[in-house]
């Protein structure tokens, strides 16, 4: 084989060796671009416009509000009242951030605020609620996470707005803040109250 032929073969073999690396780098760049472009609060929910899932969660043992035990949570809780369901956990850092806002929101008597405690130890959940104040009229313990999966929860915190008819009207992914409350959640609550 001539020197020119060997050089061409060597060049082709280098290209063939580099081709998978180039393809991998292109796919990795595309993945990172799409990952950064997404807004997690805009994750779709197939449950919007549908009735709440059927579930029955036990109460957090020993949890009280105003000297009375806080009941567990089931789909029957949502009939007849505009309700915010907050999925939370004591180990969730953004849940700590939103807890004071939820306590403030619980004073709005037009809505009821309930919670699902997600994959948490009861002692930790109680300590969390006693630290920040318990905003919930009912809180279900979802230690295995099955009910949260039925709700389509991606991670905590997530908040669902349920109308008086027991149908899910809106879903907010991430912590409730004063800004996203006034911009998105409050208008949805006002619609549900009409």
Regions found by a protein language model. Give the residues of each.
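N-terminal targeting signals for export/organelle localization
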Residues: 1-62, 194
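A short beta-strand-turn-helix
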Residues: 55-83
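Short pre-active-site segment immediately N-terminal to redox-active cysteine/selenocysteine motifs
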Residues: 81-83, 88-91, 155
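Hydrophobic beta-strand core positions in alpha/beta domains
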Residues: 84-86, 115, 161
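Conserved redox-active cysteine motifs that mediate thiol-disulfide chemistry
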Residues: 87-104
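Conserved segment of the thioredoxin-like fold in thiol-based oxidoreductases
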Residues: 105-144, 156
């Amino acid at each position: 084989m001539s020197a020119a032929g060997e050089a061409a073969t060597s060049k082709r073999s280098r290209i063939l060796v580099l081709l998978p690396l180039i393809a991998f780098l292109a796919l990795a760049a595309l993945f990172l671009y799409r990952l950064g472009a997404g807004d997690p609060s805009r994750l779709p929910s197939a449950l919007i416009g549908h009735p709440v899932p059927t579930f029955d969660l036990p109460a957090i043992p020993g949890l009280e509000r105003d000297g009375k035990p806080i009941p567990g949570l089931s789909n029957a809780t949502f009939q007849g009242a505009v309700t915010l369901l907050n999925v939370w956990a004591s180990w969730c850092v953004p849940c700590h951030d939103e807890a004071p806002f939820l306590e403030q929101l619980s004073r709005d008597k037009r809505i009821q605020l309930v919670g699902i405690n997600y994959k948490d130890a009861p002692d930790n959940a109680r300590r969390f609620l006693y630290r920040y104040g318990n905003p919930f009229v009912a809180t279900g313990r979802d230690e295995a996470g099955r009910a949260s999966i039925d709700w389509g929860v991606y991670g905590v915190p997530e908040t669902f707005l349920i109308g008086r008819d027991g149908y899910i009207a809106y879903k907010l992914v991430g912590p409730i803040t004063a800004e996203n409350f006034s911009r998105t959640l409050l208008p949805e609550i006002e619609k549900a109250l009409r």
